[in-house]
């Protein structure tokens, strides 16, 4: 019975005296009557529409459904009686009990007569809700102890639901004296059993010390659960670790959230005894130290993970402004210019990132399956092309954004980890980056530096948007409805035009999950270099003086709200004409990719599959969502196809020999291909031949010598042949 009779935990109200316990019963009765009047008489409505008794009707409806709880809004209580609301804010532990007793009495009145078998009146749980501005975990100090607080955050761990006694019965082992119906304080509060038996011992031997034990079958218990709340990522100061807070939920508040949920908590800021620093407790170091937790009285959950908390704060004036913005004929260009305006160029990439931020429409099919609406994007190419800067901007711009680096991210850190709870010694689950970013964007930098095992772990999260865990006896599925924006470098550091697909070191399984793949090259163009240098110098010179945004751009805060508003309010679908057009174009794309593979005599590392068809649908829906339109038009499909063409399709069709220096024409590429085929026919795998004789034979066939050297160089880099005997002989490996 160690869970019931642990004497090492103290409740916050018992810390510092029994002043509250000495208050008169008359005052409590009066306050309870006032709470009862509030629940019975509070009305909503107008003279024209008629009045309804809000809480009285809610109590009756919930009770008849077998749900013994009611949610009270603090603003309603304040409008009815400010003193009552003030008492509840400053001394919630005492006054919440009076409010629950009042709710039980009102429920008794409104549910009479009850059906046979249900005559026993059930206890009512009161949950609290408030529209007040929330505090942060960092702002909770000792002067707020035992007060009502409102805290936002992310649930990162949840324990199993367990039982806690609210009323216990104890019995003496020696004389069988029984004490029944002993009330327990709520929260993480234990009960210290009496050390001595208080019965009359006349004519009987004295009972020994510590004679009482708990009778579990005569205890009244409720469910309880402990949660771990973490600060929101955008509330953590730079360079600091996010802080955590333990939460205690009971009764109907259990199992309302899972790791990864963004929540706002209403509760009592309480304390419990800090763990002893020595194993046996001989040195009672830290006797006066208490650790804090929150006894939860209400939970508001961002259920769909789409930034609803942001959209809920949109005023009617802002809504009208957003609708005017969406109605602009060039809203697509305005938004794309607002994506990282300090970065020069990359227009198509910025347009693609704008589509990623808005996302497509998530669809639930009749058979229960879902199709993701979030867009995944990969930027692949040279260093110094502002890939990481774009990632940082998207993290700030997205309503929910998590930034991580590939080298410092493990599979468990990205998905979810199972660890042992230090208090209960049970296994609990903590969500990783992709769970915490549910409803937002995960930005993964240095994607190519990740270990292959860790990269495979996010396959399911990217396509099915769930994370399935089967570890340490825990088998569950977490939501990770987020977009992935990844940046990676070429295998050789810089993009080497002579190596074609060898620059890409990713498996087709991961590449097919990206809706758009941009190959970013640092091209040497004098005119572009002049403009780029001018732009960068201007940024550095005017960094201290330029405070206003460039003409025609949307500022970051407004853009962030507009994205959240569109994601919640709009879920467009393809129109019939757009769907027909897309079907025809997809067939042409597939046949073009197949013809390219046949001509180049090798499969592309970037496949064109049905996933890419769905990608174009999502891009078209995102373009429609920017305009708050219910259907994606043919123009949206045309732009989606263009974006797909300049990104993934161009990357997939970049053949092995395309773009080689000095061989840009189709005829030259065909010549190189012919040389390679003849060379492979010339000597089999495992055989060797003199390099000098190879060059001599091909020059006799009127092939240019530099072309023969280029083919040999390409085959050497691909590992198909290797030099032997002081680079005089070529040996074929594959």
Curated annotation (Swiss-Prot):
Subcellular location: Nucleus; Chromosome
Pfam families: MCM (PF00493), MCM5_C (PF21933), MCM_lid (PF17855), MCM_N (PF14551), MCM_OB (PF17207)
Keywords in alphabetical order: Acetylation, ATP-binding, Cell cycle, Chromosome, Disease variant, DNA replication, DNA-binding, Dwarfism, Helicase, Hydrolase, Nucleotide-binding, Nucleus, Phosphoprotein
GO MF entries: ATP binding; ATP hydrolysis activity; DNA replication origin binding; helicase activity; single-stranded DNA binding
Residues binding ADP, per UniProt: 371
Catalysed reaction equations from the record: ATP + H2O = ADP + phosphate + H(+)
Gene Ontology biological process terms in this record: DNA replication; DNA replication initiation; double-strand break repair via break-induced replication; regulation of DNA-templated DNA replication initiation
Recorded disease: Meier-Gorlin syndrome 8: A form of Meier-Gorlin syndrome, a syndrome characterized by bilateral microtia, aplasia/hypoplasia of the patellae, and severe intrauterine and postnatal growth retardation with short stature and poor weight gain. Additional clinical findings include anomalies of cranial sutures, microcephaly, apparently low-set and simple ears, microstomia, full lips, highly arched or cleft palate, micrognathia, genitourinary tract anomalies, and various skeletal anomalies.
Protein's job: Acts as a component of the MCM2-7 complex (MCM complex) which is the replicative helicase essential for 'once per cell cycle' DNA replication initiation and elongation in eukaryotic cells. Core component of CDC45-MCM-GINS (CMG) helicase, the molecular machine that unwinds template DNA during replication, and around which the replisome is built.
Family recorded in the similarity comment: Belongs to the MCM family.
Name under which the protein is recorded: DNA replication licensing factor MCM5
Organism expressing this protein natively: Homo sapiens (Human)
């Amino acid at each position: 019975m160690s869970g019931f009779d642990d004497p090492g935990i103290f409740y916050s109200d018992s810390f510092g005296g029994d002043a509250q316990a000495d208050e008169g019963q008359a005052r409590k009765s009066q306050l309870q009557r006032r709470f009862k009047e509030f629940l019975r008489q509070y009305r909503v409505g107008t003279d024209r529409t008629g009045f309804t008794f809000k809480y009285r009707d809610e109590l009756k409806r919930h009770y008849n459904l077998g749900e013994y709880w009611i949610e009270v809004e603090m603003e309603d209580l304040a409008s009815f009686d400010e003193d009552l609301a003030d008492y509840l804010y400053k001394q919630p532990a005492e006054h919440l009990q009076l409010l629950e007793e009042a709710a039980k009495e009102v429920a008794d009145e409104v549910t009479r007569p009850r059906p046979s078998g249900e005559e026993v009146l059930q206890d009512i749980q009161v949950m609290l809700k408030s529209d007040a501005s929330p505090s942060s975990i960092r702002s909770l100090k000792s002067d707020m102890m035992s007060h009502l607080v409102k805290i936002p955050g992310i649930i990162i761990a949840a324990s199993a639901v367990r039982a806690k006694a609210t009323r216990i019965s104890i019995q003496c082992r020696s004389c069988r004296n029984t004490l029944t119906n002993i009330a327990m304080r709520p929260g993480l509060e234990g009960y210290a059993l009496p050390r001595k038996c208080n019965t009359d011992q006349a004519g009987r031997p004295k009972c020994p010390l510590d004679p009482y034990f708990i009778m579990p079958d005569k205890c009244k218990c409720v469910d309880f659960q402990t949660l771990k709340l973490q600060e929101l990522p955008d509330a953590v100061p730079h360079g600091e670790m996010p802080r955590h807070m333990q939460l205690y939920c009971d009764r109907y508040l259990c199992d309302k959230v899972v790791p990864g949920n963004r929540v706002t908590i209403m509760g009592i800021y309480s304390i419990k005894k800090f763990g002893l620093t020595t194993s046996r407790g001989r040195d009672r170091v830290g006797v006066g130290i208490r650790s804090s937790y929150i006894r939860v009285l209400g939970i508001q959950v961002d259920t769909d993970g789409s930034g609803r908390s942001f959209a809920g704060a949109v005023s009617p004036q802002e809504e009208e402004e957003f609708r005017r913005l969406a109605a602009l004929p060039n809203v697509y260009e305005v938004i794309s210019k607002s994506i990282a305006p300090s970065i020069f160029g990359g227009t198509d990439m910025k347009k693609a990132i704008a589509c990623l931020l808005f996302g497509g429409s998530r669809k639930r099919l009749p058979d229960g399956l879902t199709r993701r609406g979030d867009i995944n994007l990969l930027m692949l190419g040279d260093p110094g092309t502002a890939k990481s800067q774009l990632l940082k901007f998207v993290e700030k711009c997205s309503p929910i954004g998590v930034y991580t680096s590939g080298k410092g991210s493990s599979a468990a850190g990205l998905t979810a980890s199972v660890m042992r709870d230090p208090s209960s010694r049970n296994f609990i689950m903590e969500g990783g980056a992709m769970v915490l970013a549910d409803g937002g964007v995960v930005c993964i930098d240095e994607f190519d530096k990740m270990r292959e095992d860790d990269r495979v772990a996010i396959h399911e999260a990217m396509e099915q948007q769930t994370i399935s865990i089967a570890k340490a006896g825990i088998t569950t599925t977490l939501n990770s409805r987020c977009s992935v924006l990844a940046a990676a470098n070429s295998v050789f550091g810089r993009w080497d035009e002579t190596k074609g697909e060898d620059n890409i070191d990713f498996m087709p399984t991961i590449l097919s999950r990206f809706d758009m793949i941009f190959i970013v090259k640092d091209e040497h163009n004098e005119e572009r270099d002049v403009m780029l240098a001018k732009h960068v110098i201007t940024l550095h010179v005017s960094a201290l003086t330029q405070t206003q945004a460039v003409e025609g751009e949307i500022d970051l805060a407004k853009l962030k709200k507009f994205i959240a508003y569109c994601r919640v309010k709009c879920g467009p679908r393809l129109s019939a004409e757009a769907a027909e057009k897309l079907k025809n174009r997809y067939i042409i794309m597939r046949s073009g990719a197949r013809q390219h593979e046949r001509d180049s005599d090798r499969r592309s590392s970037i496949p064109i599959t049905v996933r890419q068809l769905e990608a174009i649908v999502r891009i078209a829906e995102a373009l429609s969502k920017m305009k708050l339109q219910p259907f994606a038009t043919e123009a949206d499909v045309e732009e989606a196809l263009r974006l797909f063409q300049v990104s993934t399709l161009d990357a997939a069709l970049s053949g092995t020999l395309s773009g080689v220096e000095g061989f840009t024409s189709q005829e030259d590429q065909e010549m190189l291909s012919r040389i390679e085929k003849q060379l492979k026919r010339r000597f089999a795998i495992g055989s060797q031949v003199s390099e000098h004789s190879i060059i001599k034979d091909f020059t006799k066939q009127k092939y240019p010598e530099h072309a023969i050297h280029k083919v040999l160089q390409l085959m050497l880099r691909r590992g198909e042949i290797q030099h032997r005997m002081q680079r005089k002989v070529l040996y074929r490996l594959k």
